[in-house]
């Protein structure tokens, strides 16, 4: 009996971020809203779909590319942090990104130090 083994490569989307952490550095509580953009590339061979991006806190709001990203193309996730009403000091927040990629979940992080407004 002869058994033939055939290797098949299935098409998959694959997300690759340029960075997964962004540090805002120091900023004043007088300017509590900070924004950054995470750029990603579909390095797979099937269209990539971001199913959701969920922040760990209501002070952090992600918005993301809704249409499928073709292989080799780029997409973005813009994250807005609003420190208004928050205590000054260091913060670190996460954004959980779920996609149809070969790695279903990726976690992004933002951090920084909101400095106290000096009273005169």
Model region roles, listed by residue range:
Residues 1-15:
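Bacterial Sec-dependent N-terminal signal peptides
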Residues 77-85:
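Short, hydrophobic beta-strand segments
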Residues 87-116:
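Terminal connector regions
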Residues 45-76:
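Surface-exposed binding patches on compact interaction domains or structured appendages
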Residues 34-36, 75, 91, 106:
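Hydrophobic core residues within well-ordered beta-strands of beta-rich domains
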């Amino acid at each position: 009996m002869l058994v033939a083994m055939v290797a098949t490569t299935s098409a998959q989307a694959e997300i690759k971020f340029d960075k997964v952490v962004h540090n805002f550095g120091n900023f004043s509580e007088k300017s509590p809203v900070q924004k950054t953009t995470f750029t990603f590339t579909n390095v797979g061979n099937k269209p990539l779909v971001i199913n959701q991006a969920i922040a760990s806190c209501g002070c952090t709001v992600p918005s993301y590319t809704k249409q499928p990203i073709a292989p080799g193309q780029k997409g973005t996730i813009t994250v807005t942090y609003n420190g208004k009403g928050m205590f000054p000091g260091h913060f670190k927040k996460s954004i959980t990104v779920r996609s149809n990629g070969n790695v279903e979940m990726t976690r992004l992080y933002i951090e920084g130090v909101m400095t106290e407004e000096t009273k005169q």
